[in-house]
Every structure is written in structure tokens, then in C-alpha cells.
Amino acid sequence: MKIHLLLAMIGTFVVIIGAQDQEGFISLDCGLPSDESPYDDSFNGLTFTSDSTFIQTGKIDSVDKDLNINLSKQYLTLRYFPEGKRNCYSLDVKRGTTYLIVVSFVYGNYDGLNRDPNFDIHLGPNKWKRIDLDGEKEGTREEIIHKARSNSLDICLVKTGETLPIISAIEIRPLRNNTYVTQSGSLMMSFRVYLSNSDASIRYADDVHDRIWSPFNGSSHTHITTDLNINNSNAYEIPKNILQTAAIPRNASAPLIITWDPLPINAEVYLYMHFAEIQTLEANETRQFDVILRGNFNHSGFSPTKLKVFTLYTEEPMKCGSEGCYLQLVKTPNSTLPPLINAIEAYSVIEFSQLETSLSDVDAIKNIKNTYKLNKITWQGDPCLPQDLSWESIRCTYVDGSTSPTIISLDLSKSGLNGSIPQILQNFTQLQELDLSNNSLTGPVPIFLANMKTLSLINLSGNNLSGSVPQALLDKEKEGLVLKLEGNPDLCKSSFCNTEKKNKFLLPVIASAASLVIVVVVVALFFVFRKKKASPSNLHAPPSMPVSNPGHNSQSESSFTSKKIRFTYSEVQEMTNNFDKALGEGGFGVVYHGFVNVIEQVAVKLLSQSSSQGYKHFKAEVELLMRVHHINLVSLVGYCDEGEHLALIYEYMPNGDLKQHLSGKHGGFVLSWESRLKIVLDAALGLEYLHTGCVPPMVHRDIKTTNILLDQHLQAKLADFGLSRSFPIGNEKNVSTVVAGTPGYLDPEYYQTNWLTEKSDIYSFGIVLLEIISNRPIIQQSREKPHIVEWVSFMITKGDLRSIMDPNLHQDYDIGSVWKAIELAMSCVSLSSARRPNMSRVVNELKECLISETSRIGEGRDMESKGSMEFSRDIYNEVIPQAR
């Protein structure tokens, strides 16, 4: 059954336009001028906006007004692409969320050439489908159900011949993550029908997910209907008016048969069948039937639930082969009534086997692109893939389709770059060659370049850099790093460069002033020996020593210096609008929301006057954040140190902390197992940096879920460094210190001995792992085993994985990934610190957990609702195709 756009454009839609929520919907009218306001579709009430903010290329036009076709407004305009081979839309989505993605194409002879275009459409780096509009006067649409692998979704139009790619509309709808689950791959729609003799298609607002349902009336069927209300509260949320009609065989003794042809022959298909009993049965009446697919019993003795939907679906895909596909509903001997069915969906599997480029590399290169407005025509879509469409000026390393490519060479020479060398460059984890030559970059050469272990060439020549080159970078040059710095007149490779430059001027001045200096010294000594010895009580503490009062002497300078922005208290009041919006409160004080430079959101942590350790922790945190920089550590924007007023200003993290998400206090959104792994991996990378990337290394001392903050893309960053301490390098790996931390997360060995090592952080991180696994309190006195470590150990001895896991996940996870995470967590919380892994090992094992989860062969199915049931695993080793 070919799905024509005509169904969506001229079919009579049964809709109730009103209070339905379009939250999470993306509805783009491709070609709508950017200065036109969003509008509501007259058929269904969906709000469409211009696509102009989601793509920077292409031109817009309108279909030929003389065409004799009736089109909805969003199909009257289009965007076409005369430049570049690949042009991509970049859309914000949530990683791990399942989406229904619909793209529509109406040529409409916009160019007057009467040449129907053909081209490819890609989803990320993978080809989705060949689009051929030959003979498609009314246009065509393609649907796919796809789980987002990152927080950005690229939909790309790829030119393959002489005609230009076009697009008319893009519609994206979030679905529940426990529906349309596959063993692997995404789902292309084959057909979606409801059994009725109606001629009306149904979509939003009747269908809250905006799935389009076409009526289907088989010649051997008849139909029954009801006006009674149907309970549609299962995960698939089938529209009630669809469930109020059903098909039964014309011959009550015959089976109800539905057939369709496979397309292609070996296509793998998932089938979803929705049933509801809509007739009132008498005491002596029963409706019971067997569900048979391709001659195999799939579910025997099935009886639909009265006025309530029940969904049967294939747990594994099927292949129908050349004979075609057929579904039989066969009345059992005990049944007095014929079988019925209300609606059916069939999807074919499409494997998107090529993983996207490394997410950290993608984030970094897109950040650079946006910051410097690098409008290169090839810089669209995935940077490295497909290989023949990779971005100019970069080179990537490729292993195989199951491994994400990484960027190994970046050439931004002669690109008009200005300002300082961007810190985001350190996100390129495998970068070998960096060319920033012949730009207008200013400021010092940053130390982080020396910490990028894979770099073998750095070309900074032809800029306006200044200051001294970091010694660590010069040391790496001696070890083989190619470092090109020529053409920076104010940059020097020696710490004595400023002295050398001024020698010619200073020497004659010093010579002529020597006698004057001698006279001044003699006079000064005379007065010094006459002066009374100063009383110790009149001496101020040296600048390196803080005074005991948090509101330290205003005549004394602050006990630290910072290159970060120092704000006055009045500026802090202004940025927080006089502290009108509190984000939370901790031991340090209240955290407020604010703005710097009008648009940059910040979080302002204001020291409470009652905080006994406040100034000490304040000083420690500023000094630490002044010298550490990592993508997984919260950045310090600035600070305030004015009399009794102390404040820390951080980057704003709009998604709060991990604890809020686990507890459901942040919008009620349940983090998937994949999302949880990515978050703790981010946190682990930040902690690994503190332990191994800092000089000297640092112990955080307060790792917990409330100190793991999430940005708008759910990227995790460690926060709250007030308790952090450095620890020695070399043989002596611990320091004696007063015990500090949070009960429940605190390392028992550290608590007993007062000896602090990086392994104390490992213990706390293990508790965090157990928290994201189980989503249970760290300490719960009502449990037989109150502490979470004891409780999980007890459950492991029972082999009770299901009781350990967060029930909100509904078993939607890879068992191997989960067990590996539990084993890792338990090794982290070993009572002996010597038996705990280091953070590098933790990072590697979390990566393995994540790989196992993202590539799992089979995923768990939601059985929370009794309105759905999967088919038996051992019936099928083949799958379905397409409808006719």
C-alpha cells in the first residue's frame, strides 16, 4: 500500500481541535518566510512555524498556483537546495527519547521545469530512503520511528543526480519510550490502519501523538461500532474513536484474514494489533480466537477486554518471504462470536548501523562553527560521515560502523578567527593536528594545549598572540611536538623575553641613576634604624593568609587573586534582580538565578552569614576553579569578595541536579538506563580529570547526586568544590585531614583513619552508581539492610536483579550492561581502598556498559500496563513487509 501525501492533504480528518497539548512537537513549514508568524493548520489545529532557524542554506519558493490539487498551507511552500551536495536541518531533541519523524515532499512544479526531482534523505550519517517524486503529483511523505542517539538530530537532503532536492514539511513527535521497541534499528512505517467503512483519516488531535490512521475496509469484512466510551489507557494511547469501530468476518464461522505483500521481499516487520470488545455480550456469549501469523499460532485463546484496549505485538521481527504476509484471527471451538480487530500497524526495520561522530567532537566543532560563524557549505550534518560528505578542513579516523569516528585533524587557518584560543578545543579527545594559523587570535597561548596528549602538530603562526608560551608546551616540543609560532610579534618562548626587549633602554637609565639609588638607600637606612620596632598587634596579616572573620578587614586585600571576573556586591544584586529567584539552598547558603551581560544565565551562590566554614570553603572553591577547566566540571564565571558579602557565580545548569531527576522532582521525566549511564560517565570523566589531569591532583571529597548538575542537553558536570583538597604526587598518596563529606556517601576507611586519598572519591562515586541503578535512598531505616551497600549486597546474594533496579525503568535495559554496572559499583564501595579501581578504570568500564546498552540485541518491554502483551520469542525467526 503506497502511502500518498494525498491522504494527509485532502482526506477528511476527524479531529477535535482544542486543548490537546503540542508540547515536544516540532512542526516546520519548509519555505515559509522567516518574517511570517506561526499559524494553526485549518484541518487539525497543529501550529506550524518557519524552518528558517533550523537551516542556513537553501532557497524558498511556492508551488505552481495553476496546479489543480488541494493542498494544506504547509505544502504550498518548499525549500530547494541549489548549492552543495548535502544540506541539513539540525533539530534539538532529547537523547534516548523515541520520536515519530515525518517528512513531506511536494514538487508542485515550483521551478516551471516539469522535472520531478529524485534525491536521498539521510538521518544523521545514515541513508534513510531514496525519494523519487516521478508521477507523485500530490507529493509523498515518509515516516520513521527513531530513538535519538544524541541531543541533536540531523535531517539531510542529498543531491544524487541533476535535479535539486526539495522539502515541504518536517514533523517530529515524541513517543513513549516503552512503545515501538525493537531489537535493533529504527521503524519505517509500512501501514497504519483502523478497521472501518469510513472514508476519514484520523490524526491529531484525536491521536495525541499525531499518528495518521487510514480507514481499511476489506471485502470479506463487515464492521461493528459503538458509542460507548472505550478505555484507551495503555502505552500506545490509541484514539478512542478508532477503538469504537472494529472488523469482523462476514461469515461468522470463517476466520478474519488480512493479507499484504512484502516490500521488499526480505523486509523485516514488526506488527502491532489493537483490540477492544465493543459489544455487550450476553451471559451465554463468548468471543475467543487464535491469532495466527504466517500459519503459526502466535497467541491462542485470546479474548478482547470489554471496552478497554489490549495491544498484541511481535516481540521479534518476521520475514514473510515471496508468498506474502497474512494475519488470521480464527474462532476457537468454545467461542460463540466471531473474532474482531480494531486497528493494525506494521513497520519495516531499517538498520542505521553507522554510529555518529564522537559526541564530544561534534559538540566542540559545532561550538566553534557557531561562535565564529563559519558558514562553510560542507559544514552540515555529521562532521565525519558519510566519508564522501565529511566536512572540509577536518580529517577523521574510521574503525568500523560500530565505532564512532573521531576528528584527528582540524585546519582553521585563514578562517577569520578572533579573540582568544577557544577552550572548547580540549574536547577533541583524539586531535593530532591543529592549525589556527593566519587568523587574528589574541591573548596568551593556553596551557590546556599541553594537556591534549594526542597533539603532534600545533600551528599558531600569523596571529596576534602575546605573553610567554607555557613551559609545559615547550617541554612537549622537545619531546617531538611540532610547534609553529612565528608571526606573533608579542609572543615569546622565553620567560625573560620582556627583560631582553627592554635591555637597550634600561641599561643607560640604570647606569645614570646608580648614584641616586645609593643616596636613597643610605637615607632610608638612617630612618629605619631610628624608627621604633613595630608592635606585633599593629601588623596586618599578609595577603596570603585569611583573617579569621569571614567579613575580613576591608583594608586588607582578598586572600587570593583571580583572573576571573570579580564582581561588586551591587553588581551581584543587579544580576539577580535583588535576589528574587532562589534555585536552592545548601550548607554554603542560598543559590539564586541571575543574568550576566543581559543574556548569559548564571547561578549565584551567596554565602550565608551563619556558615562557620563558609569563607574557607569559598576561598578553596575559587582557587580550585581558577586553575581547572574541563567540560565535565562546572565553570566559574566570577566571584564577589566585598566585606561580609561573598558570592560565587557559576554557569547556569538548567536541568538541575541528578538527584532531582531520579526523584521525579524535575518535570517527572524518567531517565532511561542509557541516559543514566551517559550522565555518570560524564561525572566520571570530570572526576578522572581531578585525580589525574590536575597538578597537583585533587580529591573532591563530596561526590553525591546533588553535586552532579545537568545542562540543557543533560550533559553532567561536577559541582561544589568547597571541600576539595590536593593530594601528593609520588609514593605518598594520602594526607591526614579532618573528616568531611556527606553521610551515606562517606568512605568508611577515611572516616576511621582520617587518611584522605583519591579512593575516598571512588567510594562516593560507587554510592552514586548504586543510586542511579536502584533509585533508592542511601540510608533507609525501614529496610532490613538500612545502608544501600548492605541492601544491594543482600539482593545480589539472592540473585534478585529486578528488585535492585529502579522499577521506573520497566525492565527497559540490557541485562549485561546492568550487571556490569552493579559489579563496578560494588568494587568502588569495597571497604578496603586498595581493592577499589581508579577513575580511569571506572571510566573505561562505564563506556563498556554504555556500548552494551546502546547496541543491545533485545530491549525490555513495558508490562506496567496490562493493555499490551508481546508474542512468544520461540515462534518466529522471520519478519513482515508492506501493505497493499
UniProtKB/Swiss-Prot annotation:
The chain crosses the membrane at residues 509-529. InterPro entries: Kinase-like_dom_sf, Leu-rich_rpt, LRR_dom_sf, Malectin-like_Carb-bd_dom, Prot_kinase_dom, Protein_kinase_ATP_BS, Ser/Thr_kinase_AS. The modification Phosphotyrosine is found at Y650, Y750. Residues 1-19 form the signal peptide. Residues 530-884 are cytoplasmic. The modification Phosphothreonine is found at T568, T737, T742. The keyword NAD does not apply. Its main location: membrane. This is Probable leucine-rich repeat receptor-like protein kinase At2g28990. LRR repeats lie at residues 404-427, 428-451, 452-476. Belongs to the protein kinase superfamily. Ser/Thr protein kinase family. SUPFAM superfamilies: L domain-like, Protein kinase-like (PK-like). GO terms for cellular component: membrane. CDD domains: STKc_IRAK (cd14066). It is a single-pass type I membrane protein. It is found in: Membrane. Residues 577-850 form the Protein kinase domain. The active site is at D702. Pfam families: LRR_1, Malectin_like, Pkinase. It catalyses: L-seryl-[protein] + ATP = O-phospho-L-seryl-[protein] + ADP + H(+); L-threonyl-[protein] + ATP = O-phospho-L-threonyl-[protein] + ADP + H(+). Residues 20-508 are extracellular. Residues 546-559 have a biased composition (Polar residues). ATP binds at L583, G584, E585, G586, G587, F588, G589, V590, V591, K605. It comes from Arabidopsis thaliana (Mouse-ear cress).
